[in-house]
Amino acid sequence: MVERVYYKDPYLREIDAKIVDVRKEKDRVEVVLDRTIFYPEGGGQPGDRGVIKGNDFEIMVEDTIEKNGEIFHIGKLRGEIPKEGEKVKLYLDWEWRYGNMQMHTGQHILSAVLKKLYDLDTTGFNIFRDYAKIEVNGEVNWDMIERAELEVNKIIINDLPVVIEEYDKLPEEIALKLRKNVTKVKEKIRIVKIGDVDVTPCGGTHVKSTREVGIIKVLRFYKKSKNLWRIEFTCGYRAISKMNEILRDYWGSLDLMPNKNPPLIERINEVLRTVNSLENRIEELRREIWEWKGKALLKEGVKVGNYTVITHVENWNMKDAQAFAIDFVKKNSNTILLLANEKYVLFAKNEGVPVSMRELLKEVIDELGGKGGGTDNLARGRVEAKPEEIFDVALEKLRSHLQV
């Protein structure tokens, strides 16, 4: 059974150990030791990182996991393959570990305050590179978050002790104080006490006092599902780097605005109003162009019986071409519009024309090759031919259908 030194002293950064088992795959290894300061991933806390050094090898540990009671140190091997029984030195990535300890203790404080103020239970927790998240079983808003944040950071400033105790059997007086219930306990249970603020079971590593958490800052929150809200936050030195990132983004965004004075939300709304005004003007101009273009196309139309067929090589994108075609045939009775270029074909007709555009396109594709589909009034696709060939075949089919 591995000796879990990280529980005895979570501040220990290096120790000696002995290799129990080695599993190698290419340039990576999984190593089991007789004792370790590396915490394995679990309970929302990531596995530890660091270095394992032997006489003629070095393992850059990228992750630590637990499987069937064994702790595996996983990483890239440099040098010879480690041997069972070999003595090694473990060096913990302290910045990574300590940041996770700050985050984990911070989470306990935040969850305790949310429970106390709003009776919200924490149902999920995960630590990431520069932030952590919890999920709670109820709705939150900014007023609630700001109140909770103030309470949380008062607790941090008060420098309350963080005490971890292990029990074979949980005393009733402790069980009554738990923030979350313990159902199945197969072995010793670890209880984390934070002053008179929180008592909860936990298998993670924690700082010794609330002051070490530094600060807790909620970054954002949002609804995850019907009764589940996610809150993202950061703690300690990671909070400083995360807030610097956010502030650089904030001031950089503000610097791009015509009016560079805060608040950013007002500047964004000003830009949105300008964009909306320009979009309305663009739409007005588009309609004017369509009107002009429609009149020009009608003059170029070919009479097929009582109907006017317009063929045109159009370079607009499909979306704009389709919008124009629908508008054009709606305004002009007894018309058929055939648009084509190297990328697409688009056939549209006024509702009064007794020919299906879907069937017309299918006939053209059957003869020239391609693919497409649509409705009786509008069809589109791609035909393996030049626009002129497409128009010739389509006109021939239309004359046949309209019995001209």
From Swiss-Prot:
Its main location: cytoplasm. GO terms for molecular function: alanine-tRNA ligase activity; aminoacyl-tRNA deacylase activity; ATP binding; metal ion binding; nucleic acid binding. Its cofactor is Zn(2+). It comes from the Archaea. It holds the Pfam family DHHA1. Functions in trans to edit the amino acid moiety from mischarged charged tRNA(Ala). This is Alanyl-tRNA editing protein AlaX-L. It comes from Pyrococcus horikoshii (strain ATCC 700860 / DSM 12428 / JCM 9974 / NBRC 100139 / OT-3). The lineage of its organism: Archaea, Methanobacteriati, Methanobacteriota, Thermococci, Thermococcales.
